[in-house]
């Protein structure tokens, strides 16, 4: 099992190598795809072989670096017919067009847009390809390193906030949490956003267990006695990121979890052996008033949480916050192909043994299974927009933001 979504060999700035984990093959097959050009980056993002707003921004940026490196080394003959490498203005103009092309791969995720704006500025301010390549390398390294550092901060911020909130309410028992889609290591440079909070909650729980924390090396995040005991990830139809990816990460980290269907949340809340006290979700775009675009199904989960008095948190770095768009009405929601709903992609299984069927290369066999009439019309939005009224807190690397007395978020301090 691998939780390394992006492999970036960067010891030699003039000869970097990039590959991404093909997440469409998980959880049964681990395969990395090399990235050489912007077109490669576009392809893996568009096909959702890589997904998650932070990871999309990183892979998109890395694909630009790889194409720039190839031009610089003259190792990619096909660039010669597209770029005039003897004319920097021509090269810069065509690279700018390539950035627009890359952005069209997943328009809802603001992280990619923000990264491409910064790269466009670097492109504008550099005088030749060598300078651009050098400054882009530094930018991408910083982007990756800060993402991982910020994820750990967000995880601890969100976990501590929840534990202290429960303590103030007089709750000091074991509890469970909900999450949707995948927001962990596979969606970021590591650790995760919403799943990062769950990781921090689990580490806190282990610190309070003398059978686990035998040497006292694990330190609790808060003085609260409550402990997260279980996680309920939603399967997240139609792409099943919850069942394929989040469940995969929870099993890898040995965090107690039970996978549930998207339609069983209310019944699970009423029957859970541990009271469900919070839901943590990620975000592809948070606009100025706190309205949040995230994986389809997030809005209905927020409505359910509000009905049952369960705290609902959005977890995202400040790079996911769009400080220009005033509210959710201005968010463009990507619609996916009908076949992604009418077909289910998975691994062929030996039914009785529940083990993968293998091909002649001893690799699991993937297949697409039809589950709906081919003639049926399909509406398949990739995201929905949760109004800020349904969100209790926005967890960032700089702290947890809550609403004021008038029910409004103020995120201006992040900019």
UniProtKB/Swiss-Prot annotation:
Gene3D superfamilies the UniProt entry points to: translation initiation factor eif-2b, domain 1, Translation initiation factor eif-2b, domain 2
Active site per UniProt: 284 (proton donor)
Catalytic activity: 5-(methylsulfanyl)-alpha-D-ribose 1-phosphate = 5-(methylsulfanyl)-D-ribulose 1-phosphate
Residues carrying the site annotation Transition state stabilizer: 181
Keyword annotations from UniProtKB, A to Z: Amino-acid biosynthesis, Cytoplasm, Isomerase, Methionine biosynthesis, Nucleus
Record GO biological process: L-methionine salvage from methylthioadenosine
EC number in record: 5.3.1.23
A matching Pfam family: IF-2B
Localization (cell): Cytoplasm; Nucleus
GO CC annotation: cytoplasm; nucleus
A GO molecular-function descriptor: S-methyl-5-thioribose-1-phosphate isomerase activity
UniProt pathway: Amino-acid biosynthesis; L-methionine biosynthesis via salvage pathway; L-methionine from S-methyl-5-thio-alpha-D-ribose 1-phosphate: step 1/6
InterPro entries tied to this protein: IF-2B-related, IF-M1Pi, IF_2B-like_C, Initiation_fac_2B_a/b/d, M1Pi_N, NagB/RpiA_transferase-like
Family: Belongs to the eIF-2B alpha/beta/delta subunits family. MtnA subfamily.
HAMAP family assigned to the protein according to its UniProt record, in alphabetical order: Salvage_MtnA
Function: Catalyzes the interconversion of methylthioribose-1-phosphate (MTR-1-P) into methylthioribulose-1-phosphate (MTRu-1-P).
Descriptive protein name: Methylthioribose-1-phosphate isomerase
Species: Vanderwaltozyma polyspora (strain ATCC 22028 / DSM 70294 / BCRC 21397 / CBS 2163 / NBRC 10782 / NRRL Y-8283 / UCD 57-17) (Kluyveromyces polysporus)
Native organism taxonomy: Eukaryota, Fungi, Dikarya, Ascomycota, Saccharomycotina
The gene coding this protein: MRI1
